[in-house]
Amino acid sequence: MVYLSTAQQVFQIQYDLKDQFPYIFAGIAISIGTATFLNGTLVIKFGMENMVTYSLISFFSLSLIYCVLFFGTANPSIAILLTFLGLQFFSIGFLFGNLRALAMQPIGHIAGIGAAITGFISTIMAVPISTFIGRFVFGTALPLFFGFLVCSALSIAILIYLKSAKKRIKNTVEISN
């Protein structure tokens, strides 16, 4: 969501690409669409949980690389920025569907209500986070990637916690049987 609120400023003001902005926006959206399309095949091969793990690690790594390379410098060339954003959003394309499907697993019997609840929660969380990060995006796109970095690090920490909790529960059930 932070990208949606800052993309126009980054491309039109920071890079002076007012006329090209719709094409740039569409190009990055294609990376999400491509990942979503590929996800149908890859999730069968690797599983939802692995796809989430790999995608989060990719998202985190790309953010970290961008932040290290461009900390304290001016914006990189538009080609470099678009490459990083395209790869970031390619990772997001895998995350969206798989995270929603994983969230729906325990409440599949009430899928309609479950989808509404998970959509509501993700939006309620995304708005203040994107508003906060978006306030720092001026003159450079670096705060956008720092926001990606922090949010993906927190997501990985939550994922590790949930995997360990799932493992503990599984071990407890096996011991009691």
Predicted feature residues:
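Transmembrane alpha-helical cores of Major Facilitator Superfamily
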Residues: 26, 30, 86, 116-124
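Helix-to-loop junctions at the C-terminal end of transmembrane segments
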Residues: 35-51
